[in-house]
Curated annotation (Swiss-Prot):
<dbReference type="GO" id="GO:0090729">
    <property type="term" value="F:toxin activity"/>
</dbReference>
<keyword id="KW-0800">Toxin</keyword>
<comment type="similarity">
    <text>Belongs to the limacoditoxin-7 family.</text>
</comment>
<protein>
    <recommendedName>
        <fullName>U-limacoditoxin(7)-Dv63</fullName>
    </recommendedName>
</protein>
<comment type="function">
    <text>Peptide with insecticidal and antiparasitic activities. Induces irreversible paralysis in D.melanogaster when tested at high doses. It shows a moderate antiparasitic activity against the major pathogenic nematode of ruminants (H.contortus, EC(50)=41.3 uM). Does not show antimicrobial activities. Does not induce increase in intracellular calcium in mouse DRG neurons, suggesting that it does not induce pain.</text>
</comment>
<dbReference type="GO" id="GO:0005576">
    <property type="term" value="C:extracellular region"/>
</dbReference>
<feature type="signal peptide">
    <location>
        <begin position="1"/>
        <end position="19"/>
    </location>
</feature>
<keyword id="KW-0732">Signal</keyword>
<keyword id="KW-0964">Secreted</keyword>
Length: 36
């Protein structure tokens, strides 16, 4: 069985990677808006 701390760490990493993807999408949209 996983220790609770390991599960928490995996959850945080998963959420962070999703947030990074969403942030990258927003950043690219904003960059396109200002560059063009």
């Amino acid at each position: 069985m996983f220790k609770p701390r390991v599960i928490l760490l995996i959850t945080i990493i998963a959420v962070f990677s999703e947030f990074k993807k969403a942030f990258k999408g927003l950043f690219e949209k904003a960059a396109n808006k200002y560059l063009h």
